[in-house]
Design a protein with these regions (language model features):
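Flexible, gly/ser-rich surface segments that form the specificity/activation loops bordering the active-site cleft
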Residues: 116
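Charged helix-capping and loop-helix junction motifs
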Residues: 43-46, 127-136
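Conserved N-terminal beta1-alpha1 strand-loop-helix module at the mouth
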Residues: 1-81, 86-112, 141-147, 153-165, ...
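Generic low-polarity alpha-helical segments
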Residues: 113, 136-137
């Protein structure tokens, strides 16, 4: 599975790029826009082809889901700990963790979890420089939750990530820091046995 996470800030031609990514086989798009209001989020989602709405995952503005046939929700680590996800257990929910021990403790209510940073971040300079997560994934003993690697993954290292017992990857900086995001996505797909 290849997931793309939106940048926090709006990017020029972002929804056009998103539609093209879906047309090229993107599995899921996580919409993480913490700084936009309800109307801006509505406009953003409306610009994504409705045939792809079931592949969208909301990180906020959960109340918009019914308007757009969105059944997937992501909860930050702090929100998971505070029980925010409890009213969404009949939906598809995901979360984030930052170590394999926490991942191994997740129960089956979570479809998948991002684990990060796998490599030094592309979008957050200096973050993840000394990460051992890719090595720590070998200690995975939770088969109830899919493990999605995040952080510094690009077309040059994606194959190495898939060689390490992950169920998928999430791309952020590799896509949105590139002048040719669609080409990067295509190369990522080509560089794994997908």
């Amino acid at each position: 599975m290849i997931t793309v996470i939106s940048p926090e800030e709006l990017v020029q031609n972002e929804t056009e790029i998103i539609n093209q990514l879906f047309q090229e086989g993107l599995d899921l798009l996580h919409i993480r826009k913490p700084f936009i209001n309800q109307n801006e989020m509505t406009d953003f989602i409306q610009k994504i082809d409705s045939e792809f709405h079931s592949q969208l995952v909301l990180h906020s503005h959960y109340n918009l889901a019914d308007n757009f046939n969105i059944l997937r929700f992501h909860f930050r680590e702090i929100d998971r700990k505070n029980g925010l996800s409890q009213s969404f257990t009949d939906k598809t929910i995901s979360t984030s963790v930052h170590d394999i021990e926490t991942f191994n403790e997740l129960n089956e209510e979570w479809e998948y979890a991002f684990i990060s940073p796998v490599f030094p971040s592309i979008s957050k300079k200096g973050y993840g420089e000394n990460s051992n997560i890719l090595n720590d994934i070998k200690k995975r003993d939770n088969s109830n939750v899919e493990l999605i690697a995040l952080g510094g993954i690009n077309e040059n290292n994606i194959h190495h990530v898939f060689d390490n017992n992950v169920d998928g990857v999430a791309l952020l900086g590799a896509i949105w820091e590139s002048n040719q995001p669609l080409n990067v996505f295509k190369k990522c797909k080509q560089n794994i046995n997908y």
